Structure formats: structure tokens, C-alpha cells
A protein has these predicted regions:
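Carbohydrate-active catalytic/glycan-binding domains of CAZyme proteins
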Residues: 1-313, 350-352, 394-396
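Lectin-like carbohydrate-binding module/patch detector with strong preference for beta-trefoil
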Residues: 308-463
Length: 463
């Protein structure tokens, strides 16, 4: 099960048995290959039971440059064996499902506070050290309201002791660090890095002649240096982790940022399995202890964190199949079919659907030509997805948010499988698809678009 996630860019020659790559190392990268799986699917985990008798599975999954994450799956027992998946779709995990039935009332919230102004008595739980830290060489109290890192000798960033990190959060995010480098001594360097193998960084280096801005990309082994007249800068990393790329930039006022260097490639590697991490660092390249760097703040912005608008509840939408760009259409023969984009059918009310909220992620889709609610009949074969005048339990779908570009899937609660088409045959929609491929081009992934006009007044239908 890949949940529709491709294997991204991959480092082939950095693994557990390989040394830590030094500057100038050659990295052998491989790009995405359609629906090739590799080690992306759910793997390595276990199962747990709840007091009410439900079972759930947890497992790892490699989400491109975000790294290895944890997935939760409903578990079904059959013939004495546990299967990830629902009774009607063993072996496949829905991307969205009702949460485990636990006694506690838990409101939705972010698991971590990622931004830190370093004003508290301790580091926030989201932070992790890249190496065992030297306790006497970092402080939150020497300069109240700042994280102070004293520089220790290191030949390069990957060996720096007091580097503090947190996971880069996807699908996209921006990390901004406010660095006061006044306390750096010659040979010191401090800044913000994308911790990976290869890594990339942007920061301030103190030379015998003064301060310079230094940008480095280990993949290309390219360095960019610019003289600085100030010792305080804002450093920024903007990452698109679905596409394995990032951009580094800097600012002297915290408002106007200037990109430095080109686009950074963020591959996944099997040395740490962690993908890309944001890191604050300070070390000395001359083989001695040096000065200090003060990080005044660290802020993470997640423009896609609010998913509430990704399910168009109460809205009228069109649905387009991601595989072949055909428009989902309830045809006059009473079945869900496809219409060519721009055609009379695609522009008509039979290709408009009102999304009704039925709670817990469930929706009912009302066809705006007055023919009824999309309902799965029979066993969900081709032409078994039909508009019926009366809504029933067989009209319920679990909306699957695919996180990007208004992509979604519809899981029938009757068959516990997805609606879809075979893009090569032109057959009507069915509700017997087990899931999608990593490239999402198998006919099960849809793209919704809100429409401004309903074309005809919605009719009162029996429920």
C-alpha cells in the first residue's frame, strides 16, 4: 500500500554500510519511475487491540524527502490471521478512515509546536540533537530569549556536535531562523541547514577579514560566498517535499528575502532513513573551539496545514478523472460515466454534484440534474454506480483527501472499495477498485473543482 505516493528521488550509494559522505563526494541519484514501488509501501510495524475489540495496525512508510513516517491501518481478522484493511478490501489501507474508538475525547490538534522563540526554560519536545550534545556548549539562559550554540571543532556540517534539528514537515513548509552572529570568531560558521545526505546549508562564516554569507550544496559541491556588512541575518529554507526540492534564501530585515543558489534536490537515503530535517548549527573549521551563535527565533510556516477546505462540504463541484482528464458524468441511462471535457454533457447539470456532509468524513453526492444521489448497487461492478432518487446507506462514500491539487478518491462504504474507471476501455464507473497506483493514473483519483452555478435549482429528494 502506497496511499498514492510515488517513490521520489533516491540516493543509491549512501546506506548503512557506507561512510558519512564528505564534501566532494559523488552521489548516485535515481528519479521517480512511474508506479515503481521500491521500499515505499507500508512496511515494518505491529498490531494493537482496543478495549472494544477493534484492532489497528501501525507501520512505517517512506514519504519521499519527508522521510520515514508512521501510518495507521484498520485491521481485519480472517481465518485466524490479521490483515491490514477493511473486510471488503483486505491488504489495502484507506487514506482516510474513522479514528480508533478510544474513551478519551481528543480534539484535533498539531502533535508538535514547531516554532520556537527560545524563551522557555527548555527546548520544545520537537527538537532533537543530531549528535550527543556537549551540555556546557549550548544554553537558553546565557542570553535569555535566544538559543546560544558555542562552536566546537568539526571538519564539516555532518560532523558538527551541537546541531539541533527537527523533521521538515510536508507537503510544503518554510523554516526561518533569526541568527545573531556577532559572537562568532574566525573559522566559525553558523546557520540553517537541510540535514540530509547530501545536505545543503546557508549561514554566516567569520573569516579574518569579516563576515560572509555562505551557501553550500553538497550534491553539486557548489559554494557561494557573499561579503556581509551585518552580523545579524534571517535565514530561510522553503521546501516542497512532495517534489523533493527546496530553496535557500536570506534577509537582513526579516521581510524581503533574496534567493541564493539554485533549487536544492532533496533525495531520500538509507543512511538515516529520516529524509530531510531542518537544522540549526554552529561549528569551527579550524580545529578548535571558537565563539558563539545566538538564534533569536525559529519559525515554521505550513501553508497547507489547514485541510478543512480540502473537502468541499456543501458545495457544488465537478469531478475530473486524473488519469485521462475525462469529466465524471451521470448519464441519462442512469449510470456514472465519463464525458469529454468541454462537451455539452460535461458542461451540463449531470456533471455537477453537491457534496453533502454526513459526518465522520462521509459524504453523499447529489447529482444536480435532479436524478438523485450517487448510490452503489449490486456488488459494485461497472455501471453499478448510479443516481437513485432515495438516499440510503449505499449512497455513502468516505472522502479521501490526497493532499495536493484538489485530488481525492471516493471509498464506497457498501463495497469498502473505491470508485473508478479503466482509462483504456471507456467503461462506466464501478466501485470495486482496491486502491490507486503510486502515479495515481489508474482511474481512481479524481480532481474536484467548485462551480459557481448549479445550472438547475436543487430538487427536494427523499432520503
Amino acid at each position: 500500500e502506497t496511499l498514492g505516493t510515488q517513490r521520489g528521488w533516491w540516493v543509491q550509494n549512501v546506506g548503512l554500510d557506507r561512510p558519512v559522505p564528505e564534501p566532494g563526494a559523488t552521489f548516485q541519484l535515481e528519479g521517480p519511475r512511474g508506479s515503481y514501488l521500491g521500499a515505499v509501501p507500508l512496511h515494518q510495524g505491529g498490531i494493537v487491540d482496543l478495549p472494544n475489540g477493534d484492532w489497528w495496525g501501525f507501520s512505517m512508510m517512506d514519504f519521499r524527502s519527508v522521510g520515514r513516517t508512521t501510518a495507521l491501518s484498520p485491521v481485519t481478522w480472517k481465518d485466524g490471521w490479521p490483515y491490514f484493511g477493511l473486510p471488503g478490501n483486505l491488504g489495502r489501507t484507506p487514506r482516510t478512515w474513522t479514528k480508533p474508538a478510544v474513551a478519551a475525547e481528543v480534539a484535533p490538534r498539531a502533535p508538535y509546536q514547531r516554532s520556537d522563540d527560545f524563551s522557555g526554560p527548555a527546548l520544545l519536545p520537537v527538537w532533537q540533537w543530531n549528535h550527543n550534545p556537549v551540555e556546557s556548549k549550548w544554553s537558553l539562559t546565557e542570553k535569555p530569549g535566544a538559543l546560544r550554540l558555542h562552536t566546537l571543532p568539526a571538519s564539516q556540517f555532518l560532523w558538527a556536535r551541537n546541531s539541533i534539528t527537527q523533521r521538515a514537515i510536508g507537503p510544503v513548509s518554510t523554516a526561518t531562523a533569526d541568527l545573531d552572529a556577532t559572537g562568532l570568531q574566525p573559522g566559525d560558521t553558523a546557520g540553517l541547514a537541510l540535514l540530509n545526505m547530501p545536505f545543503a546549508s546557508i549561514g554566516i562564516m567569520r573569516t579574518d577579514a569579516g563576515f560572509i554569507l555562505r551557501w553550500y550544496d553538497q550534491l553539486s559541491n557548489e559554494t557561494i560566498e557573499k561579503p556581509l556588512s551585518l552580523s545579524r541575518v534571517f535565514l530561510r529554507a522553503t521546501g516542497d517535499y512532495d517534489n523533493d526540492v527546496a530553496q535557500l534564501s536570506y534577509s537582513t530585515d526579516g521581510k524581503n528575502f533574496t534567493d541564493v543558489g539554485g533549487e536544492i534536490r532533496l533525495p531520500y537515503q538509507l543512511k538515516t532513513f529520516q529524509g530531510t530535517r531542518y537544522a540549526l548549527f554552529a561549528f569551527n573549521t579550524r580545529g578548535r573551539e571558537g565563539g558563539r551563535a545566538d538564534f533569536e527565533s525559529f519559525r515554521v510556516d505550513e501553508p497547507m496545514a489547514d485541510r478543512s477546505q480540502n473537502v468541499p462540504l456543501g458545495k457544488v463541484v465537478t469531478l475530473t478523472n486524473f488519469a485521462n482528464d475525462s469529466v465524471v458524468w451521470a448519464n441519462p441511462h442512469g449510470m456514472l460515466h465519463s464525458a469529454q471535457r468541454g462537451s455539452e454533457e460535461a458542461e451540463g447539470p449531470g456533471a455537477r454534484f453537491r457534496v453533502h456532509d454526513r459526518g465522520q468524513g462521509r459524504v453523499a453526492l447529489e447529482v444536480m440534474d435532479g436524478s438523485g444521489y450517487l448510490t452503489v448497487v449490486g456488488v459494485g461492478l461497472s455501471a453499478d454506480v448510479r443516481p437513485l432518487n432515495q438516499e440510503s446507506a449505499d449512497s455513502l462514500f468516505m472522502w479521501q483527501d490526497m493532499l495536493r491539487d484538489r485530488q481525492c478518491m471516493l471509498l464506497s462504504l457498501k463495497t469498502q472499495r473505491f470508485i473508478g474507471i479503466d482509462p483504456a476501455t471507456g467503461a462506466p464507473y464501478s466501485a470495486d477498485w482496491v486502491g490507486t497506483h503510486p502515479d495515481r493514473k489508474d482511474g481512481t483519483v479524481l480532481v474536484w473543482q467548485e462551480t459557481e452555478s448549479e445550472l438547475v435549482p436543487p430538487q427536494v429528494l427523499l432520503r
